């Protein structure tokens, strides 16, 4: 807001005299005859605003006023604001320049001109536009599958920014008209990932921020690879599972947990676990069980190591035939890192 200076008491008679000469007695500035309608000037925050005013001759007495009071009376500056100056590119111009415009400068400004014939006023309404700026957005969150999720994105700007949400996937859906809040009911694992909030108006480029949503879900076996191998050769059984958090794996043979020993080695990395047999013997042939577990659940799959030529073609299958006590024990063991 353009501030107004207080005149020194010693100068008060002179100031009053000047104002009496400038403004007709008994005629308020805002009640004089209007020769022009109100002009609107739109300026972006931080730019310079030029409010134009012209007089008919050099003998005219001129003043600039706003809702706070007098800014300039003739050549005398009443405002304390250093951003405000007169713009006089010709003898008949009496324009007002406001640098680094801010929102509190918005409002009506009046150029009052006292000529030899009658007073005139010209009104200008300054509109300050503000680029969009996201002021608050939800933090990254982790939820369990099936939960309800509400994401919040708040933005400031003039005109008021339009907010849109978008799920950042190759086929990401754009949620139009959601305003500040994006609600996801019964979230699924496919809805995990980054969500982008965009705040836009016509003043400047949109402001964009992101929030990551992590969805926890229990393991699901995505691949279980059985294999054949001759005695004396190496063999490999592979088990993969999808889960968040990343699953832990265990291997069983005839209800007995397998450890990396006696020619057997287990390598688990991320969502994959490998059971490797260094030197296949007759006792290695048969059924193996891969168990994947995290804090939300446990699942298993049966895989086979068989002799070449037996005709068994089996890429493994999810099996529920494993005793429940084994699944429960596996989950407990995995969660306790036994």
UniProtKB/Swiss-Prot annotation:
Disulfide bonds join 53-111, 153-197, 239-290. It holds the Pfam family I-set. Keywords: Cell adhesion, Cell membrane, Disulfide bond, Glycoprotein, GPI-anchor, Immunoglobulin domain, Lipoprotein, Membrane, Repeat, Signal. One of its GO terms (biological process) is cell adhesion. Residues 29-122, 132-214, 219-306 form the Ig-like C2-type domain. A lipid is attached at residue 315 (GPI-anchor amidated asparagine). GO terms for cellular component: plasma membrane; side of membrane. Residues 316-338 form a propeptide. Its main location: membrane. Residues 1-28 form the signal peptide. It is a lipid-anchor; GPI-anchor. Transmembrane segments: none annotated. Glycans are attached at residues 40, 66, 136, 148, 279, 287, 300, 315. Belongs to the immunoglobulin superfamily. IgLON family. This is Limbic system-associated membrane protein. It comes from Gallus gallus (Chicken). The lineage of its organism: Eukaryota, Metazoa, Chordata, Craniata, Vertebrata.
């Amino acid at each position: 807001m353009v501030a107004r200076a207080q005149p020194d008491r010693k100068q008060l008679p002179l100031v009053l005299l000047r104002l009496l000469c400038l403004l007709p007695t008994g005629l308020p500035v805002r009640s004089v005859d209007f020769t022009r309608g109100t002009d609107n000037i739109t300026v972006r925050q931080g730019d310079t605003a030029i409010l134009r005013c012209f007089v008919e001759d050099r003998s005219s007495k001129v003043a600039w006023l706003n809702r706070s009071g007098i800014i300039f009376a003739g050549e005398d500056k009443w405002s304390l604001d250093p951003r405000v100056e007169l713009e006089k590119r010709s003898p008949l111009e009496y324009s007002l320049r406001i640098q680094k415009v801010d929102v509190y400068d918005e409002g009506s400004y009046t150029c009052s001109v006292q000529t030899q014939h009658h007073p005139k006023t010209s009104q200008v309404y300054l509109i300050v536009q503000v680029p969009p700026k996201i002021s608050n957005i939800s933090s990254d969150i982790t939820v369990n599958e099936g939960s309800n999720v509400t994401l919040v994105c708040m933005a400031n700007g003039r005109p008021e920014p339009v907010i849109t949400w978008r799920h950042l996937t190759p086929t990401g859906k754009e949620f139009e008209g959601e305003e500040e809040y994006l609600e996801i009911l019964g979230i699924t694992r496919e809805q995990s990932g980054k969500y982008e909030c965009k705040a836009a108006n016509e003043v400047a480029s949109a402001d964009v921020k992101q929030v990551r949503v992590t969805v926890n879900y229990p393991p699901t076996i995505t691949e279980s690879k059985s294999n054949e191998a001759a005695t004396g050769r190496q063999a490999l059984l592979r088990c993969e599972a999808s889960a968040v958090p990343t699953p832990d794996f265990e291997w069983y043979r005839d209800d007995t947990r397998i450890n990396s020993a006696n020619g057997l080695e287990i390598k688990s990395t991320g969502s994959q676990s490998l059971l490797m047999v260094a030197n296949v013997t007759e006792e290695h042939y048969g059924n193996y069980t891969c168990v994947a577990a995290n804090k939300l659940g446990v699942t298993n799959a049966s895989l086979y190591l068989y002799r070449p030529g037996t005709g068994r073609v089996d890429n493994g299958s999810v099996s529920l035939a494993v005793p429940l006590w084994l699944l429960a024990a596996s989950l407990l063991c995995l969660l306790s890192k036994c």
